A protein has these predicted regions:
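Long, contiguous interaction/recruitment modules in multidomain scaffold/adaptor proteins
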Residues: 1-4, 119-120
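Structural signature of tandem alpha-helical TPR/SEL1-like repeats
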Residues: 18-28, 53-65, 87-99
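Helix-start (N-cap) detector for alpha-helical repeat units in TPR-like alpha-solenoids
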Residues: 5-6, 40-41, 74-75, 108
Length: 120
C-alpha cells in the first residue's frame, strides 16, 4: 500500500466514523493496520474508535500497538490513561496520565518562546 493509498483509507475511515458508520471505519482502520503495521496514526485511530464504542479490550490492544511505536506521544498516553480508567485500574490510568503531562512539559521546555506570552 502506498502512502497516498494509506492516507486515503485513513481519511475515508475518519469520514465514516464522523458519519456514525463505526463498523465501516473499523474495517478500514483494520485494513490500514494490516497493510502498514507501523502506522501510529492508524493504530491510535483504531484505539479511539474502539474506545468510543466501549470495546475496551480492542481499544487497549490497538493503543498498546500505537504506544510501542511512539511511547512519548502525548495523545497515546492520554488515550491509554482513559482506557485504563474505564477498565477500573486507577494506578495504570494515573501512570499514563503522568506520562502525558511529562511529555507536555518537555514540549513546553523545548519551545519556551511560544509559552512566554501565555494563553491568548
Amino acid at each position: 500500500m502506498t502512502d497516498d493509498e494509506l492516507q486515503t483509507l485513513f481519511e475515508d475511515a475518519t469520514s465514516d466514523y464522523a458519519m456514525c458508520e463505526s463498523d465501516a471505519a473499523l474495517a478500514k482502520l483494520a485494513r490500514a493496520t494490516a497493510a502498514v503495521s507501523e502506522s501510529f496514526e492508524a493504530w491510535h485511530a483504531l484505539a479511539e474508535v474502539n474506545f468510543s464504542l466501549r470495546r475496551l479490550d480492542a481499544a487497549l490492544a490497538a493503543a498498546d500497538r500505537a504506544h510501542a511505536l511512539r511511547p512519548q506521544d502525548l495523545f497515546i498516553n492520554t488515550t491509554l490513561s482513559r482506557i485504563w480508567m474505564e477498565r477500573g485500574d486507577k494506578a495504570r490510568a494515573e501512570h499514563f496520565g503522568a506520562q502525558a503531562k511529562i511529555g507536555a512539559w518537555k514540549d513546553q521546555l523545548k519551545k519556551p518562546d511560544q509559552q512566554a506570552g501565555g494563553v491568548k
